[in-house]
UniProtKB/Swiss-Prot annotation:
GO terms for biological process: D-arabinose catabolic process; L-fucose catabolic process. It comes from Escherichia coli O17:K52:H18 (strain UMN026 / ExPEC). It comes from the Bacteria. Pathway: Carbohydrate degradation; L-fucose degradation; L-lactaldehyde and glycerone phosphate from L-fucose: step 1/3. Keywords: Carbohydrate metabolism, Cytoplasm, Fucose metabolism, Isomerase, Manganese, Metal-binding. This is L-fucose isomerase.
Length: 591
């Protein structure tokens, strides 16, 4: 099959159409703004898959309806998924704007005195607001000279934030969520809401029973040579932790090998179901070779699978990581327990950053007093106000050990295109694989166990659906925390010490849900959350506004909150504006 092309960014230079001197004097400056914008975006951004971002510039400057239509025809033929309109001057507002109702759009009006770029910006945004097609405003803080071709830092920040979020919107559109199984243990996020995916994300849901995974394994609908490669890789790289099961439930070497083999097969088959695998045509499995065009997936597992077959922990952890037996590659998005709403938060984080995402239970709030009582240790530094224990048996990406390093040598999680094989090996070396606890997983399996290094900035997110309101997004920026080993051991052994742990300290504001760490835990909307590397809450906020998903909780500085200009007309409190605007405009792909 022909590979689906990646979305491009359309650049629309608009101009004052009056000939006999006005337009002619502005052509070069206007087109240079478009070229400078395209150069910035192609230099600074990549798609989540690692491919270079492409920009498509209108063949001519746009002065009115005819040239706007010609530009639209070009964009439609080149898979443009978002647009940025640029101008240094007055132009004719509603005649020149991008009217596509679902394509994210921004307008950069040059802040100069010679020509009124700001006046066009205001006029065009007024037209967008009146027509119900929200657009983002970009206007530099400081006046520039007419011949200044540089892009100021504040303008650059908005251009990049808009483009990152817009590319995420465009990349999700038309893809599918693979729901492998049904509802896991009554977890609401695994009650997959087709309307949410269709109306807010522009995605389909592909529902497949877990017997399809069983069929593929039993009927050998996979690449047998790759399975041998995967087993050899695991033999070389896997370190095994203690078996905490009672003697009667411990497996011998032959049984353990069978569990490992099936766990790796699950990873291969889930991957093939998501994206397809042309090698399956070689064994006569053309239909299965196509996959389901899934950009994200979830695996129910518990309990209808895990009561008799190996659990999904190994498969999910490997798929969500940035590497496997084939080397470093783009991480997949696979949600434990088919928690589709946590899967969407993972998908957002991956699309915005290109990095692996850490899926976790938001398990326990530990107050400073409670930790001192049970360990004798007094918390300090980032942890002084208490910490949240993030831990789950399943799909935490191994990148979450933070054994990768940034340019200054600090622990981090990198976009996959920046990860070296040595860093991938370091993450594997920091991970132990512990036999699954029989009481939870009667069919066996292996859980990854690692401890996230401390002092790393993270953003924790979660999507929830509220009846009568729709989807909402929660955001909590903070840091991982490193505890003394003896303190970690005491706390970890009070829960399940065979699972991966991140000790998380959210940044507090002293207000609302961020009054203290307890309040963050108390206001979290579900049992799961996602960690994305960096303090990227502002990007999540911009993305959510494009999709019309209100943010019900965040600790991002107000100066970094960037939403469409029409939000300002929905009241004076910016979070109330968000709710009213999202309700007014409705989901991006209204159904």
């Amino acid at each position: 099959m022909k590979k689906i092309s990646l979305p491009k960014i359309g650049i629309r230079p608009v101009i004052d159409g009056r000939r006999m001197g006005v337009r002619e004097s502005l052509e070069e400056q206007t087109m240079n703004m478009a070229k400078a914008t395209a150069a910035l975006l192609t230099e600074k951004l990549r798609h989540a898959c690692g491919a270079a971002v492409e920009c498509v510039i209108s063949d001519t400057c746009i002065a009115g309806m005819a040239e706007a239509a010609a530009c639209e025809e070009k964009f439609s033929s080149q898979n443009v998924g978002l647009t940025i309109t640029v101008t240094p001057c007055w132009c004719y507002g509603s005649e020149t704007i991008d009217m596509d109702p679902t394509r994210p759009k921004a307008i950069w009006g040059f802040n100069g005195t010679e020509r009124p770029g700001a006046v066009y910006l205001a006029a065009a945004l007024a037209a967008h607001s009146q027509k119900g097609i929200p657009a983002f405003s970009i206007y530099g803080h400081d006046v520039q000279d007419a011949d200044d071709t540089s892009i100021p830092a504040d303008v650059e920040e908005k251009l990049l934030r808009f483009a990152r979020a817009g590319l995420a919107v465009a990349s999700m559109k038309g893809k599918s969520y693979l729901s492998l199984g049904g509802v896991s243990m009554g977890i609401a996020g695994s009650i997959v809401d087709h309307n949410f995916f269709e109306s807010w994300l522009g995605m389909k849901v592909q529902a497949v029973d877990m017997t399809e995974l069983r069929r593929r394994i039993d009927q050998k609908i996979y690449d047998e040579a790759e399975l041998e490669m995967a087993l050899a890789w695991a033999d070389k790289n896997f370190r095994y932790g203690e078996d905490e099961n009672n003697k009667q439930y411990q497996r011998n070497a032959e049984q353990s090998r069978a569990v490992l083999r099936e766990s790796l097969l699950m990873a291969m088959c889930i991957r093939d179901m998501m994206q397809g695998n042309s090698k399956l045509t070689d064994i006569g499995r053309v239909e299965e070779s196509l996959g389901y065009n899934a950009i994200a997936a979830g695996f129910q597992g518990q309990r209808h699978w895990t009561d008799q077959y190996p659990n999904g922990d190994t498969a999910e952890a490997i798929l969500n990581s940035s590497f496997d037996w084939n080397g470093v590659r783009e991480p997949f998005v696979v949600a434990t327990e088919n928690d589709s709403l946590n899967g969407v938060a993972m998908l957002m984080g991956h699309q915005l950053t290109g990095t692996a995402q850490v899926f976790a239970d938001v398990r326990t709030y530990w107050s400073p007093e409670a930790i001192e009582r049970v360990t004798g240790h007094k918390l300090d530094g980032l942890a002084e106000h208490g910490i949240i224990h993030l831990i789950n048996s399943g799909s935490a990406a191994l990148d979450g050990s933070c054994k990768q390093r940034d340019s200054e040598g600090n622990p981090t999680m990198k976009p996959h295109w920046e990860i070296s094989q040595q860093e991938a090996d370091a993450c594997l070396a920091a991970t132990e694989w512990c036999p699954a606890i029989h009481e939870y997983f009667r069919g066996g399996g292996y859980s990854s166990r690692f401890l996230t290094e401390g002092g790393v900035p993270f953003t924790m997110t979660r999507v929830n659906i509220i009846k009568g309101l729709g989807p909402v997004l929660q955001i909590a920026e903070g840091w991982s925390v490193e505890l003394p080993k003896d303190v970690h051991d005491i706390l970890n052994k009070r829960t399940n010490s065979t699972w991966p742990t991140t000790w998380f300290a959210p940044r507090l504001t002293g207000k609302g849900p961020f009054t203290d760490v307890y309040s963050v835990m108390a206001n979290w909307g579900a049992n799961h959350g996602v960690l994305t590397i960096g303090h990227v809450g502002a990007d999540f906020i911009t993305l959510a506004s494009m999709l019309r998903i209100p943010v019900c909780m965040h600790n991002v500085e107000e100066t970094k909150v960037y939403r469409p200009s029409a939000w300002a007309a929905h009241g004076m409190d910016i979070e109330g504006q968000d709710y009213r605007a999202c309700q007014n405009y409705g989901p991006l792909y209204k159904r």
